[in-house]
C-alpha cells in the first residue's frame, strides 16, 4: 500500500449564511462557509417559495410573438 496518499482532514467549523454553525470533518480546511444548510433550505424547513411562472410565460410569448407572424 502507498503511504501518504490520503488528503489531510481537519475538524472544520462550517458556517452558513443564515448563521447556523456546525462541526464536521473536512478536507477543505478548518473554516468552511456555505450558502445554504438544512436549517434554512426550503426543502427541510417546509417554507416553499412559489415562482410566478404565468407572468414569465406571458412575457416570453409577448416578446417572441412577432417571430411567429412571418410564416
Swiss-Prot record:
Q: Name any one Pfam family assigned in the record.
A: Ribosomal_L31
Keywords tagged on the record: Metal-binding, Ribonucleoprotein, Ribosomal protein, RNA-binding, rRNA-binding, Zinc
| Keyword Ribosomal protein among record annotations | yes
In this chain, Zn(2+) is annotated as bound at: 16, 18, 37, 40
GO molecular-function annotation terms?
A: metal ion binding; rRNA binding; structural constituent of ribosome
Q: Which GO terms describe its cellular component?
A: ribonucleoprotein complex; ribosome
Q: What does the record note about the cofactor? A: Binds 1 zinc ion per subunit.
Q: What does this protein do?
A: Binds the 23S rRNA.
* The protein's assembly and partners: Part of the 50S ribosomal subunit.
- Indicate what this protein is called per its UniProt record: Large ribosomal subunit protein bL31
Which gene produces this protein?
A: rpmE
Amino acid at each position: 500500500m502507498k503511504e501518504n496518499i490520503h488528503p489531510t482532514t481537519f475538524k472544520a467549523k462550517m458556517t452558513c449564511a443564515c448563521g447556523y454553525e456546525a462541526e464536521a470533518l473536512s478536507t477543505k480546511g478548518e473554516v468552511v462557509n456555505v450558502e445554504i444548510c438544512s436549517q434554512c433550505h426550503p426543502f427541510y424547513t417546509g417554507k416553499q417559495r412559489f415562482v410566478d411562472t404565468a407572468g414569465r410565460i406571458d412575457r416570453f410569448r409577448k416578446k417572441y410573438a412577432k417571430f411567429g407572424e412571418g410564416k
